[in-house]
């Protein structure tokens, strides 16, 4: 993570414009502790000294989830975010919602799962029976498939609720934040000066409108996921090596035990054999000694 943390600096944040908030009349009072001041244009300035540690904490949380085989969901449906959200989520092998948040995505996950199953069914139908279906039937099925793919294509392989979500503009994505909050799913979000950070688990104070800022945040999050996945892979490989070493040690110990047992048995058998050889002579001598004893005449 150190290489990622090296990119999280006040200088880099300033260069992408992360310090530029909204006009003062649009501010949310709950963001007051993250505001440095006001510009001449009556725009709030974000305190980047606070953003740096909070961003690093958020990236650590995301990396930890990925390192434990968790699912990370990228959420950003505003025009300037949708393409980047999809690109970066795909790059790190995670999931995304980038066009419209399906209401009940989390709280009614069973319905979403059924829609994903329909998508798979339509694809198989077109692939296996496309030649048999009429043109009208193919067009109808394809329209249904495209509609589901458009809104749920980014979560079709998620296989369950995410373990953490990353949100660009929680004010716009308030439904996603509310659903995650109800189900106890941690939320990482970039909070601008007009946002309410009260339901954000890991808030990142900063500009959530600038294209450069969004690219910067999403790139860092995707890299944090990749670091987590790499960490998990290394841990598994290390565990496999340890297991093999333990197995080898157990085999050696078992083999040594067998050899020791065989040696003890051989020694015992030899001692018994010697005892048998000596025993008849001793018995004969006892009989002779008994014959020499004077008879007790009473």
UniProtKB/Swiss-Prot annotation:
PROSITE patterns: RIBOSOMAL_S2_2. Keywords: Ribonucleoprotein, Ribosomal protein. Gene3D superfamilies: Glucose-6-phosphate isomerase like protein, domain 1 (3.40.50.10490), Helix hairpin bin (1.10.287.610). The keyword Transmembrane helix does not apply. SUPFAM superfamilies: Ribosomal protein S2. Residues 237-298 are annotated as: Disordered. GO terms for molecular function: structural constituent of ribosome. It holds the Pfam family Ribosomal_S2. Residues 237-259, 280-298 have a biased composition (Basic and acidic residues). Belongs to the universal ribosomal protein uS2 family. PANTHER family: 30S RIBOSOMAL PROTEIN S2 PROKARYOTIC AND ORGANELLAR (PTHR12534), SMALL RIBOSOMAL SUBUNIT PROTEIN US2M (PTHR12534:SF0). This is Small ribosomal subunit protein uS2. It comes from Neorickettsia sennetsu (strain ATCC VR-367 / Miyayama).
């Amino acid at each position: 993570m150190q290489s990622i943390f090296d990119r999280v600096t006040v200088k880099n944040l300033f260069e992408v414009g992360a310090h530029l908030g909204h006009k003062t009349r649009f501010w949310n009072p709950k963001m007051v502790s993250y505001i440095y001041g006001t510009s001449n244009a009556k725009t709030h300035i974000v305190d980047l000294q606070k953003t740096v540690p909070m961003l690093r904490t958020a990236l650590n949380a995301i990396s930890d989830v990925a390192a434990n085989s968790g699912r990370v969901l990228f959420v950003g449906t505003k025009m300037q975010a949708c393409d980047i959200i999809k690109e970066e989520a795909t790059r790190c092998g995670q999931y995304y919602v980038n066009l419209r948040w399906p209401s009940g995505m989390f709280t009614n996950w069973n319905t979403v799962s059924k829609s994903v199953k329909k998508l798979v069914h339509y694809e198989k139908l077109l692939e296996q029976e496309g030649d048999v279906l009429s043109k009208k039937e193919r067009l109808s099925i394809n329209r249904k498939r495209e509609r589901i793919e458009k809104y749920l294509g980014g979560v079709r392989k998620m296989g369950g609720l995410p373990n953490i979500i990353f949100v660009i503009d929680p004010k716009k994505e308030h439904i996603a934040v509310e659903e995650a909050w109800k189900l106890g799913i941690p939320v990482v979000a970039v909070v601008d000066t007009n946002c309410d950070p009260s339901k954000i688990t890991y808030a990142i104070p900063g500009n959530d409108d600038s294209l450069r800022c969004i690219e910067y945040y999403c790139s860092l999050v995707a890299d944090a996921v990749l670091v987590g996945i790499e960490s998990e892979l290394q841990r598994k490989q290390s565990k496999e090596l340890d297991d093999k070493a333990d197995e080898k040690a157990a085999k050696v110990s078992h083999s040594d035990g067998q050899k020791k047992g065989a040696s003890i048995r051989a020694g015992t058998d030899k001692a018994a054999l010697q005892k048998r050889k000596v025993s008849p002579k001793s018995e004969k001598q006892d009989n002779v000694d008994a014959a020499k004893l004077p008879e007790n005449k009473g």
